Amino acid sequence: EANENALKLASFHTGRKKVVAFSKSFHGRTSAAVRVTDNPNIVAPLNEGLDVEFLPLNDIQAVKEALKNKDVCAVIIEGIQGVGGIQVPETEFLKSLREVCSATGTILILDEIQSGYGRSGKFFAHQHAGIRPDMITTAKGMGNGFPIGGVLISPLFKPVYGMLGTTFGGNHLACSAAIAVLDVMKGEKLVENAATVGSYLIKKLNAFPQIKEIRGMGLMIGIEMNEPVMQLRNSLLFEQKVFTGASGTHVIRLLPPLNLSKQDADLFLSRFNNALNS
């Protein structure tokens, strides 16, 4: 819902219809959000009307070519791709993307729904690159499981009453939950903890010779293996009692709680080692 509103506002503001998104992206399952998701299997014929061009992540020349005619209303990109396998946009790419969007009057939308709220070791993942988008979409961690979403909108946009609406964006109970989340995050220094424990975990995982590549930031980590991970995940779950996510066939996705301690990380590493060698 947050991404739907962001895309809609970008189109209202620019008067344009086309959107640029990136390969392996995931932005949602409804209407415009599913159309800018790079998975044709979940895009129904009903959703196909939106003009979307998918470009390779980190290919700034492709972006410049796509935006040169100044007919694109928005570029939407995840702070870190989650479903796509924990793909981290390069810092220089994000900086150049900001410049190209500004030069062509294109709205830059940062989807921080999975990568935001401290997950990456900063409040929003794009802050690692030091850029300022035109809109930031957020949900998931915003309510710590309680349904709520939101769009952070630049002063560039002039609000018009009734232009946008949400089901999950403004009810009193959800907002109370979101405020409580912020209080706990600040009081327990969870963003700093995600950075510290995440760096520790990534360093330790890089020592495993069986792993092809480690990607991610903070406590948003992708473990790419040389072989399919189904058997490894089953061993972790049923034998080691460790639940993990996945992306595709070869990537284990780690999204642990932001209060994960080094002791918790060591326990995971021990059980991960057991599963690898079982």
Give each language-model segment a name.
Residues 1-278:
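Conserved N-terminal phosphate-binding loop of PLP-dependent enzymes in the Aspartate aminotransferase
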